[in-house]
């Protein structure tokens, strides 16, 4: 299968691509800055196309001939425009997939219940899933909780704070409960999802344990052999 991957320069995309290659797929990586992929061990095994999801014409050219695609990009910028950019990018990608006659789009969104107060970024990620699924190409949307793995932003934060500060004054969100999931599990699910058939669907994925960020930092400190950390939410 010929697969278009956006976000190949990112944390998950850079780990997903070699798994797809190993599975026998022909991979096309769309990157705004292709040079970021130079030197990676799998660079010679893939086709790299310079492009941007906000460029509708270039995106359609990159998608032509592809059977399926991964949408692994979203804006983390601040300001009022990020949601509009996310919306436009998703619409461009939906249209490019439809024009190419793709079998499936796999999108990694964020876990959060519908109908509740969501952060602007999480609400935008849900909206992106809806925009992608509004076209002709079926979409598998994986909504993941906090992804834990070496190098992930979540893990680095959970590690760095206990490593540096024996006493921490933290925001109240450290008491927010979530279902952390290992990056290896997310990658396995992404690889499996490209083989989905049938209609669009949303799949919520998380690990077996429900923990607060405070509890996760305490677990890390214990596993790392650090003295018990005092965490004071304010």
Short names for language-model regions:
Residues 1-25:
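N-terminal Rossmann NAD(P)H-binding glycine-rich loop of SDR-like oxidoreductase domains
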Residues 2, 193-234:
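Mid/C-terminal beta-alpha module of Rossmann-like enzyme folds, strongest
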Residues 6, 30, 72-73, 105-110, ...:
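SDR active-site strand-loop-helix element
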Residues 25-32:
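Conserved glycine-rich Rossmann-like NAD(P)H-binding loop of the short-chain dehydrogenase/reductase
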Residues 35-100, 110-115:
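NAD(P)H-binding glycine-rich loop region in Rossmannoid oxidoreductase-like domains
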Residues 83-87, 117-129, 133, 147-148, ...:
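Short-chain dehydrogenase/reductase
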Residues 89, 153-154, 173-194, 201-204, ...:
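Substrate-positioning beta->alpha
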Residues 109, 130-153, 157-164, 169-172:
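Conserved beta-loop-beta element that borders a ligand/cofactor-binding pocket
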């Amino acid at each position: 299968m010929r697969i278009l991957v956006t976000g190949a320069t990112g944390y998950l995309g850079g780990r997903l691509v070699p798994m797809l290659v190993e599975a026998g797929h022909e991979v096309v990586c769309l990157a705004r800055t292709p040079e970021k992929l130079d030197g990676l061990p799998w660079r010679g095994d893939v086709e790299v196309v310079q492009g941007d999801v906000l460029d509708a014409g270039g995106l359609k050219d990159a998608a032509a001939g592809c059977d399926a695609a991964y949408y692994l990009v979203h804006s983390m910028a601040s300001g009022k425009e990020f949601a509009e950019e996310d919306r436009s990018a998703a619409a461009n990608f939906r249209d490019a997939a439809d024009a190419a006659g793709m079998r499936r789009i796999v999108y990694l969104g964020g876990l959060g219940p519908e109908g509740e107060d969501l952060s602007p970024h999480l609400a935008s990620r849900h909206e992106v899933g809806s925009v992608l699924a509004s076209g002709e190409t079926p979409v598998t949307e994986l909504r993941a909780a906090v992804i834990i793995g070496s190098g992930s932003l979540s893990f680095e934060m959970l590690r760095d704070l206990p490593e540096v500060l024996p006493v921490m004054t933290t925001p109240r969100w450290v008491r927010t409960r979530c279902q952390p999931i290992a990056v290896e599990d997310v990658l396995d699910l992404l690889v499996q999802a490209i083989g989905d058939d049938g209609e669009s669907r949303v799949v919520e994925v998380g690990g077996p344990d429900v923990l607060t960020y405070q509890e996760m930092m305490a677990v890390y400190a214990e596993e790392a052999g650090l003295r018990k950390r005092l965490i004071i939410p304010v």
